[in-house]
């Protein structure tokens, strides 16, 4: 009895295991008739469903068992036939606005596509998984993709768990939850891998965020799919303004209508033989959607686009929003153009618009555009300096640079260059490209390794001061961990310019990379343990110490130094400490702890007077982004500006972007007012210059004058007009993505931000009025456009969101040194500027019928003067008192 019972238990266990492991099966000789619909809608995430644009395809779908593997019962070949096709709008439009009204499926799809879509196809179904799809290879790609979408609705399994599987949208991690007669299939879309390629901006602050979800709910009856409902959403938004977002919603529904008598299965040993017997034109075409290239009928070519936008790209139009908008249109056209087309436009462009065209061609970042611009520019000639520098800056701001771009600059640097300034810019910009490629994980590419070796060895390979500075600035852009020892070495240099560049470069590194040895070097510089340093060098060293996780003793020694420094540096360091406390910078808790010691914190130390200052504040705070600024100004003891440093930062998505840094440095000007230089600065050559860092890219510094004779000649010929530091068009945000949907349709998303910018600065001296004035002027216009489209070769629908603005920011410092203490007034003004948001939606048929809707909202943001410390306000009243 016991052996028999044991045998029964074993048989029961085997049967149960077999049942759990079995997949869904269709019966022979039966036809399963379903209704099917797939719908795609596009809108803003906050838009009402009635405001969607898109289309719906509905049909009947008949499925029957064509063949079953005699050895593996769960391997089945299904024949699927689509019929009674209808195409209609997914939005709720009036009859007047419904472009699908009165149109038949044949008039929309075309006779060839309709016949191909209604042609039966085969699906190899094993354990509920689609292993292959068979169709005629000559069928249009759009038709095959729609068939893949229908087949994807059959994907299922009868036990819970996670696995990687492929359907129309790609190979993804899928989670199944099985409960009696219901199967819930959740696809983790962030894991999906497909044949589609795209690119995005490297900076999270300027980048795009996405949210996506996909779920299919399958209801079973007697082991057969009774219904399957799929919902898939993709939302893309601009990090700096999440309201500017687009959404695509895809729905699929498969519902069993009836089960009727159908054809019997075909006999055969293997799949290949059966498929050939059914239709010798059938080939395995894969499950994942294939790429399609919809043809744009009536779209303008590059020359036509250029003629339409060139008037908005003239220099006098760059401060208007039309300039970056036209720039984005031109970049879009350039990316579809050949090298010869691009060269033709370059060669037939006016001199005034050519610099802007160079910006656009370089920003296109295609092999054709790069090859065309390199052939057009002649770096051996000095007279092309403006165009050459615009090309180099556009490379530095490239959103997704390639190895070929870096290799091209390396070859330019090794060739004949007619201008010293261009030679410097080439090397400096190579550093910026190096960093961006390393951030993409491409640090081991051959060109990257060559440039890395060049930059690391560069400072020690030359005795020319300008070349050493060039390599140090390139390292400041590259931010290589291997560059820290090189920068630490030059930070202690006897040449002030080397020290300043090296120290400000170290400040850009992650504090975790600043080693104890580097900190010791910075402390030696600040406290002058080995030699005397210039004030601006010591101040820069103090900034790095305070921002690099300082120790208790480091902070204490900084505080104890106040009172033993040159007069204006005492005031600068005091302002710096107070700014750390007021703005709650990372070191503020440690500073508070040190200040509990009365030796470090007392009235004598904290009552130092002077005009130097350090101040941080908020420019803007929104739910999406926080924008801060800081202004540091250091004067010599005689009242002449030594260093002015303005920084603007943007923070979003836990990432920081150094949006702007403008530094004006001056030295050796005491002789103009018969004043005595500070300690360590007695032998400095007269010099004034300006350096800019824009969107994390250090640009080549600009010299106002160098040497006493140059100073005097410029003073007598000075017009008072500011000197341009950087001017041009920048592709700030650049995101391109193709989203394969489970329905077999493909959504394309493009987000781009164009910025026209003009940064200039100047210094004015009046010996008669004993007054100096420095100015930094920032003017620009910003346009951001994001669109999501589903474009087949028979219908297209899309939604576009955007916003634009024009702004001016001026920073002016006025110093009156007719008496001591001298009067200093700092002004940071933002003018009133317009702000516009737009939303447009569109549906279009090949016949030319189109529905479009556009809405916009305008507002004016009032201008303001950014608040600085109260001491500055009091000083400004005195400076401008006579005028009041």
From Swiss-Prot:
GO terms for cellular component: basolateral plasma membrane; endoplasmic reticulum; Golgi apparatus. Transmembrane segments: none annotated. It is found in: Endoplasmic reticulum; Golgi apparatus. It comes from the Eukaryota. Residues 1-21 form the signal peptide. Glycans are attached at residues 348, 787. Catalyzes the transport of triglyceride between phospholipid surfaces. Catalyzes the transport of cholesteryl ester, and phospholipid between phospholipid surfaces. Required for the assembly and secretion of plasma lipoproteins that contain apolipoprotein B. Required for yolk lipid utilization and absorption of dietary lipids in larvae. This is Microsomal triglyceride transfer protein large subunit. The lineage of its organism: Eukaryota, Metazoa, Chordata, Craniata, Vertebrata.
């Amino acid at each position: 009895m016991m052996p028999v019972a044991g045998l029964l238990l074993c048989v029961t266990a085997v049967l149960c295991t077999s049942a759990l492991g079995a997949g869904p099966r269709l019966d022979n000789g039966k036809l399963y008739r379903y209704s099917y619909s797939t719908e795609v809608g596009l809108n803003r995430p906050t838009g009402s469903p009635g405001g969607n644009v898109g289309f719906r395809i509905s049909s009947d779908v008949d499925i029957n068992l064509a063949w079953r593997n005699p050895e593996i019962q769960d391997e089945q070949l299904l024949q699927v036939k689509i019929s009674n096709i209808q195409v209609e709008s997914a939005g709720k439009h009036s009859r007047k606005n419904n472009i699908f009204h009165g149109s038949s499926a044949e008039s929309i799809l075309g006779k060839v596509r309709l016949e191909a879509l209604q042609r039966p196809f085969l699906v190899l179904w094993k354990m509920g998984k689609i292993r292959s799809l068979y169709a005629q290879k000559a069928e249009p790609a759009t038709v095959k993709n729609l068939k893949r979408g229908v087949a994807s609705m059959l994907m299922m399994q009868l036990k819970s768990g996670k696995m990687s599987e492929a359907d129309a949208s790609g190979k993804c991690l899928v989670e199944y939850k099985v409960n009696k007669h219901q199967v819930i299939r959740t696809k983790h879309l962030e894991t999906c891998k497909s044949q589609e390629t795209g690119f995005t901006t490297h900076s999270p602050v300027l980048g795009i965020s996405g949210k996506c979800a996909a779920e299919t709910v399958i209801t079973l009856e007697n082991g057969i799919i009774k219904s399957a409902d799929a919902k898939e959403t993709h939302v893309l938004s601009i990090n700096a303004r999440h309201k500017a977002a687009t959404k695509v919603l895809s729905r699929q529904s498969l519902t069993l209508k009836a089960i009727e008598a159908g054809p019997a299965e075909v006999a055969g040993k293997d799949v290949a033989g059966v498929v050939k017997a059914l239709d010798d034109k059938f080939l395995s075409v894969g499950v994942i959607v294939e790429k399609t290239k919809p043809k744009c009928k009536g779209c303008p070519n590059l020359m036509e686009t250029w003629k339409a936008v060139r008037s908005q790209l003239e220099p006098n139009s760059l401060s208007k929003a039309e300039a970056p908008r036209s720039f984005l249109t031109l970049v879009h056209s350039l990316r579809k153009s050949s090298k010869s087309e691009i060269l033709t436009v370059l060669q037939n462009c006016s001199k005034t618009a050519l610099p802007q065209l160079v910006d656009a061609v370089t920003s296109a970042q295609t092999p054709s555009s790069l090859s065309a611009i390199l052939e057009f520019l002649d770096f051996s000639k000095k007279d092309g300096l403006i165009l050459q520098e615009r090309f180099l800056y556009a490379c530095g701001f490239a959103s997704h640079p390639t190895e070929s771009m870096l290799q091209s600059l390396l070859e330019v640097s090794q060739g004949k260059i007619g201008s010293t300034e261009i030679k410097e810019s080439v090397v400096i910009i190579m550093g910026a490209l190096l960093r961006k490629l390393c951030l993409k994980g491409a640090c081991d590419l051959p060109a990257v390794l060559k440039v890395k070796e060049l930059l690391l060895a560069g400072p020690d390979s030359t005795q020319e001061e300008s070349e050493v500075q060039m390599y140090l600035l390139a390292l400041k852009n590259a931010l290589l961990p291997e560059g820290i020892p090189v920068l630490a070495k030059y930070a202690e240099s006897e040449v002030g310019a080397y020290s300043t560049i090296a120290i400000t470069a170290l400040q850009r590194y992650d504090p975790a990379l600043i080693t104890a040895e580097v900190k010791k070097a910075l402390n030696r510089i600040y406290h002058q343990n080995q030699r005397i340093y210039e004030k601006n060098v010591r101040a820069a060293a103090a900034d790095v110490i305070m921002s690099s996780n300082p120790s208790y003793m480091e902070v204490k020694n900084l505080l104890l130094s106040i009172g033993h420094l040159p007069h204006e540096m005492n005031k600068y360091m005091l302002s710096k400490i107070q700014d750390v406390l007021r703005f709650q910078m990372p070191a503020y808790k440690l500073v508070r702890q040190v200040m509990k010691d009365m030796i470090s914190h007392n009235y004598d130390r904290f009552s130092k007077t002077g005009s130097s200052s350090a101040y941080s504040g908020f420019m803007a705070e929104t739910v999406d982004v926080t924008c801060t600024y800081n202004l540091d100004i250091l004067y010599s003891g005689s009242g002449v500006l030594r260093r002015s440093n303005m920084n603007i930062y943007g923070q979003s998505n836990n990432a920081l972007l150094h949006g702007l840094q403008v530094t004006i440095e001056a030295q050796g000007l005491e002789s103009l007012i018969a004043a005595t230089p500070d300690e360590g600065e007695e032998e400095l050559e007269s010099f004034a210059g300006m350096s800019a860092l824009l969107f994390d890219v250090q640009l080549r510094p600009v010299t106002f004058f160098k040497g006493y004779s140059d100073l005097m000649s410029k003073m007598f010929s000075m017009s008072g007009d500011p000197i341009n530091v950087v001017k041009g068009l920048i592709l700030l945000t650049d995101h391109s993505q193709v989203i394969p949907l489970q329905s077999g349709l493909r959504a394309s998303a493009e987000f781009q931000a164009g910025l026209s910018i003009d940064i200039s600065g100047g210094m004015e001296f009046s010996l008669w009025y004993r007054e100096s004035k420095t100015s930094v002027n920032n003017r620009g216009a910003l346009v951001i456009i994001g669109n999501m489209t589903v474009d087949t070769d028979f219908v297209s629908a899309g939604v576009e969101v955007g916003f634009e603005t024009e702004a001016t920011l001026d920073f002016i410092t006025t110093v009156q040194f007719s008496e001591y203490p001298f009067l200093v007034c700092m002004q940071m003004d933002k003018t009133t500027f317009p702000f516009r948001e737009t939303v447009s939606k569109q549906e279009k048929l090949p016949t030319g019928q189109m529905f479009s809707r556009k809405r916009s909202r305008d507002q004016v943001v009032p201008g303001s003067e950014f608040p600085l410390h109260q001491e500055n306000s009091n000083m400004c009243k005195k400076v401008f008192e006579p005028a009041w």
